[in-house]
Amino acid sequence: MFEGVLPAIVTPFQNDHAKSLDLLGLQSNLAFLVSKGVHGVVPCGSTGESATLSFEEHVKVIEATIEAVAGKVPVLAGAGSNNTDEAIRFTRSAKDLGADGVLIISPYYNRPNRSGLIKHFSAIADLDIPVVLYNVPSRTGQNLSPDLVAELSRHPNIVGIKEASGNISQVSQIIEETMDQDFTVISGDDGMTLPVMALGGGGVISVAANVEPERMVGMYRAYTEGDWDDAISLHYELAPLFRALFIDSNPIPVKKAINLRGLASGPLRLPLDELDAEKTAALTEVLSTYD
């Protein structure tokens, strides 16, 4: 269900110091992405500034996303928290709204032990909705080890992992240890998309696809159709963008990039702040090469 290129979408805010959502802008962005052939969308993730959204705003963003894509592509809704009860509340809401699955980041800051992680993810998966785990140690301070992921993959509702550890050996081991399950490993790093797919992964949850959806979809399609040379060529064509979108904390650069492309973005919510002039100039220069 969750394979291909799935943009982790931004949450546009109004120009009122980001106090309110721009849902019309969100839906316009989604129409653009779907028209470019993306295979799914991921609202309310890190790129969507989920940490600064209220519960009510989570509901509105997911509801607007589901309405906008109108069944054309699956919606994998961010529903994670370092509070298990809150993650359950987010997940139950996403399920009731009609999301196709939920993306659950590993609990951050409180650093649970192994048994706590198993109980946390299992309690969410027991709500009977497809769950994709999200491993991003650079943000959470904790790594989901391959053997832990393999154990979790045996839960019938845990269907995949967004792997953003940056460790290709770990990705390989996860794929190896989950081959006997209906379980998909998805890259959480645009620059690792092809290496992960070459090992048997299913695609990417992408930041860059907000900016260059056609090229990202083209790279995925070239690989799946056996045109390895074209896939590699597109990877290197996109590599400067991959780097530029992380010249500052995500989603600061990507919100600036889509704004420069004429898509809905709006301001960031504190504690995130706008890209400075020097980095904006560098990003603009990279974007100009894709015009």
Curated annotation (Swiss-Prot):
Alphabetical list of InterPro entries matching this protein: Aldolase_TIM (IPR013785), DapA (IPR005263), DapA-like (IPR002220), Schiff_base-form_aldolases_AS (IPR020625), Schiff_base-form_aldolases_CS (IPR020624)
Site (Part of a proton relay during catalysis): 46, 109
PROSITE patterns the record matches: DHDPS_1, DHDPS_2
Binding site for pyruvate: 47, 205
Record's protein name: 4-hydroxy-tetrahydrodipicolinate synthase
Family recorded in the similarity comment: Belongs to the DapA family.
Enzyme class: lyase
The protein's Enzyme Commission number: 4.3.3.7
GO annotation, cellular component aspect: cytoplasm
Gene Ontology MF terms: 2-dehydro-3-deoxy-phosphogluconate aldolase activity; 4-hydroxy-tetrahydrodipicolinate synthase activity
NCBIfam families the record matches: dapA
One matching Pfam family: DHDPS
Catalytic machinery residues: 134 (proton donor/acceptor), 162 (schiff-base intermediate with substrate)
Species annotation: Methanosphaerula palustris (strain ATCC BAA-1556 / DSM 19958 / E1-9c)
